[in-house]
């Protein structure tokens, strides 16, 4: 019953644009040793804006509108016993149909900066091993709001605090930061035309500290404001007190407050000021096999496993996953001539998603990615790399039934997906 957007299903589209995501790698080789360092957004990063807010924000408004109309009906029914005409279910107030309107917006930014240091040692011409550590600094920001909420023809602030037009607004403004460390080990074995490699990154424990300035409505003043509205409309004070003090009305208002507070906690409780939030990076296993049938051709296949089930997140959300993430990839690289190398690759990503895990504030879906790339060998010391890949995301559909009262419920259906294009440029320099 969104009067500003009555179409169903409704689309909530987020736009992300990252023009530059830099990374640097450095290796110093001497004898059997290789000292290595790198800087990159290893734990993920980017910005996304939802100009019309999120579906979970509208869910709060929609359920509040229905609950408000139920309360209005109960109040007017009790008021009739005292000869007071229906006020709150009239078309000039909440009405009876649960219609609502609101304005909303959401913007998120997340960067996990990683600085890696490590060393590799060549035990023989065929076998080498690596050990290192990555320091991770996490920095995130979330800003969003739900404002100008109206149920029927009644601005919601009028029954929360008539003197303050922003009394019903929900506003989120949160900065998060945290630090973690990732131990890394790896091995590499070469024999003839074959190359076998494995790497394991241990789980990175990160606790994000919130610094927030949030605003949430309070329904605690609802009884007094309804009572004052009656008196301002000419209803005797004794009758107004009797109507609002009726046990049925008191119970309905208590239930409304409990449900509203629970919805707010679910939506933005994670971002309360001063909280420390778990934001672990999962352990990661990578296995790879390379084969070169001729000197100019190299074929690679790989497997990745992310132990998401044991990477702690807010309210142990990771426990809702069926399993960790599995990735399979393959690629071919061909030296066309002394100056040009071309390549192509594919990757399948499969998450262990469940309906309960999905959340529009942060979600992933399975995908297939295809890429093409090339290297221009400028000279013996410099190579210019370019690449493009597109990710074909799957759809994850969920359904949920929310019981608002003994005789009223809402069924929600959601369809999550994404779209992604990446262009990359790199420069290799051999000193």
Regions flagged by a language model, labelled:
Residues 1-17:
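Surface-exposed strand-loop-strand hairpins of Gram-negative outer-membrane beta-barrel proteins
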Residues 21, 27-431:
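Outer-membrane beta-barrel porins/channels
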């Amino acid at each position: 019953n969104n009067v500003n957007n009555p179409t169903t299903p409704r689309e909530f589209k987020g736009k992300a644009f990252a023009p530059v995501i830099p990374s640097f790698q450095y290796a110093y080789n001497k004898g059997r040793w290789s000292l290595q360092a790198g800087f990159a957004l290893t734990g993920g990063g980017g910005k996304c804006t939802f100009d019309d807010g999120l579906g979970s924000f509208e869910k709060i408004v929609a359920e509040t509108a229905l609950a408000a109309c139920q309360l209005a009906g109960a109040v007017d029914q009790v008021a009739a016993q005292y000869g007071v005409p229906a006020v709150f279910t009239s078309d000039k107030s909440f009405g009876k149909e649960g219609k609502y309107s609101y304005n909303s917006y959401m913007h998120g930014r997340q960067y996990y900066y990683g600085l890696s240091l490590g060393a590799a040692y060549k035990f023989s011409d065929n076998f080498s091993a690596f050990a290192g550590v990555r320091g991770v600094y996490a920095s995130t920001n979330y800003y969003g709001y739900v404002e100008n909420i109206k149920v029927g023809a009644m601005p919601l602030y009028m029954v929360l605090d008539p003197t303050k037009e922003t009394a019903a607004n929900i506003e989120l403004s949160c900065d998060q930061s945290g630090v973690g460390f990732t131990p890394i080990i790896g091995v590499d074995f070469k024999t003839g035309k074959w190359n076998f490699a494995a790497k394991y990154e241990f789980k990175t424990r990160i606790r994000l500290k919130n610094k927030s300035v949030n605003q949430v409505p309070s329904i605690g003043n609802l009884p007094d404001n309804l009572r004052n509205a009656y008196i301002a409309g000419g209803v005797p004070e004794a009758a107004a007190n009797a109507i609002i003090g009726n046990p049925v009305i008191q119970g309905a208002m208590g239930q409304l407050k409990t449900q509203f507070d629970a919805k707010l906690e679910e939506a933005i409780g994670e971002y309360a000021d001063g909280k420390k939030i778990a934001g672990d990076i999962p352990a990661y296993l990578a296995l790879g096999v390379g084969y070169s049938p001729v000197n100019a051709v190299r074929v690679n296949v790989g497997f990745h496993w992310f132990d998401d089930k044991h990477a702690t997140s807010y309210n142990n959300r990771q426990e809702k996953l069926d399993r960790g993430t599995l990735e399979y990839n393959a690629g071919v690289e061909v030296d066309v001539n002394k100056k040009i190398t071309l390549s192509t690759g594919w990757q399948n990503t499969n998450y262990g998603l469940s309906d309960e895990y999905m959340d529009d504030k942060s979600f992933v879906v399975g995908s297939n990615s295809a890429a093409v790339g090339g290297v221009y060998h400028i000279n013996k010391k410099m190579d210019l790399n370019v690449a493009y890949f597109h990710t074909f995301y799957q759809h994850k559909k969920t359904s949920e039934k929310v019981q608002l009262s003994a005789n009223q419920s809402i069924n929600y259906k959601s369809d999550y997906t994404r779209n992604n294009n990446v262009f990359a440029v790199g420069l290799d320099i051999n000193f």
